[in-house]
Each structure stands twice: as C-alpha cells, then as structure tokens.
Amino acid sequence: MVSIKVSLADFIVKTEEGWIPSDNCPALDRFKTKTEKELLDSIKKEGADRASIRKQLFLTSISNKRLTQLGGVPVRDIRTSTTIPSSTRNLITDWLLNIFNDEESGEEVESAIASKYPDIFCSADKISRVAQRLENRRDRVHEDGFRILSATMLAIDSDIATEGKCEIVRATEDAIIAKFEPVSEHLCIGNPRGVFYKAFPIKKEQPMVYGVKALLGISNRDFIMNHGHGHLRTVPYSEINNAVRSFAKKNEAEIKRIRSDSLSPNAGEKFINMCDMLLQKEKIETVIAKIMKSDKN
C-alpha cells in the first residue's frame, strides 16, 4: 500500500458563478464542455504533462449539465475514488470555498495553482491533519488559509505554522521538533499512521546537528527521511516499506536534487544509501530489505 491521495476536485469545482462543493454522480460524466473535451484529449497523448493538464481542468468551469442539488461533478480525470469521512469533507470544503471565493485573494490563488502548484493531488494524511486544525476555531488555519494550502500542496516548504496539527516537543539551537499523533478516527482518510516527528531548521540551508540528535532520541532511532521540503521526518519501522515505495516514485532528477540537499546528510547514512540505490536502479524490494535490516539492527 502506498500513500493515499486526494484531489482538490474531491472537495470543490469551478463554475461560471464561482466555486461550489463537489458532488459525485457518474451518470453526469457524459456531459463536457468543449474546453474540457480538448484538455481530456490532450491528457491522453503520449508524453503529456498530465499534472499541468489536471490543473487546467480544475481551473476550468464545469458544464452546467453536471450541476446537482449538492454541487458540481468534476471530470473523472481530476477526482479520486478515495473514501473521505463526512467530517473531513465538510471542514475542508468550507475552508477551500472561503479561500477560492475570496474577492481579494481568489484570483491570486488560481494563479498560484497554475504556476506554482505541482499538481491538484495531495497527501490524504496532510489533508486530514489540516481538518484537525480546522476543528479549533482559534487556530490560525482560518486566517492563513492560502499559505497553509500552498504548503499542503507542496508549492512552498512547510514550517510549524503551515503544517497539519502537531505539537512542538523540543527546541535546540538549530531546530524545532514537532510531534504528529495519529489522526482522529472521525477525520482520518485511509489507515491511521503511527506517531512521527519532524525537525525544522532554525536557519535554512544550515545543518541540524543538535536537532538531529534530539530527533533520534525522541523517536527511538526511527528511520529519518528528507523529502526535499525543508525539514526532516521520522518514519516508524512498520511504515518504512510504504515510505520507500512512495519516495521511489519521484523522478530521477528529483531524487538527485534531494540527495544533494543540504539537509540530507543530517538524515543519516541509511537515507543517503537509499537514494544511491534508487539512482542505481536497484530493485525496490532490495532497497527496502536493506533499509529495514539496518534499521532493525
């Protein structure tokens, strides 16, 4: 099992009058606008930049024939079949509608999606953790929605302020460490993850010597990964298999970039070896076995 994804289109769709909630009605899939048909034809072509086309489809007004009593139906290519708890769906939908329909920043958000967001798909776990923050009316997630959305969608590096719900558990000279508990059952999309930690550097591009020592101690020496988003993350032993498989889906250029990132040496020798093995096209089963064996010992 690899990381579960959700799409922004699972929550909201664009119409001529603005953004409205998404609905699911396969019977209406047959109705498409001319623009949607052209984009859907282009996404099927060999070598197509599917992520870019998905963003265009998301930012295109849907056919009026796909409106229902509850909202609008996104085209099949930009929605997922992921089961989303109603509590999470309601919280995230209302939050996104406030962001996208804002008179002052709405256009800026759409422009950012087109030019800066890598895709409209994102981690279901990240979305679940944003929903946890939304339950607290005093949380900054209600005022700083655009920036938190951008971090959730990996358009900008995250920090403590833009992460999903977490608790600061340690601060060193060079890092702040946060603990992420399993997501509450009523908000969790997919299977709950175990406890993990993230270390955020005090100064960008500077190694986290004391922070990593603290991270290893707090996490009981869990495997540490750098995903290239400006922080380090621990992975519980039982989740290494999924984590490595998910990381291996990155393209070669991205893995090389992360391998040479200033934070990667702090992640440790096992992480560097994993990157090297993936770049050398080792079988994924071999990579996982080596990482888990060394981690166990």
Swiss-Prot record:
ATP binds at D119, I120, F121, K198, H227, G228, H229, R233. Participates in replication and packaging of the viral genome. Plays a crucial role, together with NSP5, in the formation of virus factories (viroplasms) which are large inclusions in the host cytoplasm where replication intermediates are assembled and viral RNA replication takes place. Displays ssRNA binding, NTPase, RNA triphosphatase (RTPase) and ATP-independent helix-unwinding activities. The unwinding activity may prepare and organize plus-strand RNAs for packaging and replication by removing interfering secondary structures. Belongs to the rotavirus NSP2 family. Signal peptide: none annotated. Transmembrane segments: none annotated. It comes from Rotavirus X (strain RVX/Human/China/NADRV-J19/1997/GXP[X]). This is Non-structural protein 2. The keyword Transmembrane helix does not apply.
